[in-house]
């Protein structure tokens, strides 16, 4: 199984949720509403879930082994970190690379 695409949208809230993501598996299957949560021990990925009538949350889709969970978490958190980097201003980068020779 390969994660072939990760789409991530940051959310600005006062809560612990930092982003919502969708992943594509093997270019054939998409899972939406994967959340990036800021937990007590750092960022982690929460799979999509729904609330049952008794108030409990149940995963809609989830990996069945730790290796697959690790792949999903690594891919989503890598996309989150890239989204956190400031954009590079191409004009200032070009100006800095010009060296005057006298």
Curated annotation (Swiss-Prot):
Gene Ontology BP, a term:
sporulation resulting in formation of a cellular spore
Is Cell division one of the keywords UniProt gives this record? yes
For this protein, the parts annotated as crossing the membrane are: none
Report which superkingdom the organism of origin falls in.
Bacteria
Instruction: Read off the InterPro entries from this record.
Output: SpoVG, SpoVG_sf
Which Pfam family, just one, is annotated for this protein? Answer: SpoVG
Is Membrane one of the keywords?
no
Keywords attached to this entry: Cell cycle, Cell division, Septation
Could you tell me which PANTHER family the record lists for this protein?
SEPTATION PROTEIN SPOVG-RELATED
Its function? Could be involved in septation.
The UniProt entry's sequence similarity note says: Belongs to the SpoVG family.
Query: What protein am I looking at?
Result: Putative septation protein SpoVG 1
Q: Which organism is it from?
A: Listeria monocytogenes serovar 1/2a (strain ATCC BAA-679 / EGD-e)
Q: Its encoding gene is what?
A: spoVG1
């Amino acid at each position: 199984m390969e994660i072939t695409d990760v789409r991530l949208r940051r959310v600005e809230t006062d809560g612990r949720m930092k982003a919502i993501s969708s992943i594509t598996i093997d270019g054939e299957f998409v899972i939406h509403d994967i959340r990036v949560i800021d937990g007590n021990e750092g960022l982690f990925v929460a799979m999509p879930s729904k609330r049952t009538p008794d108030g409990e949350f149940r995963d809609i889709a989830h990996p069945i082994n730790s290796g697959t969970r690790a792949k999903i978490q690594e891919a989503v958190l890598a996309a989150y970190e890239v989204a956190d980097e400031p954009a590079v201003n191409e004009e200032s980068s070009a100006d800095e690379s010009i060296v005057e020779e006298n």
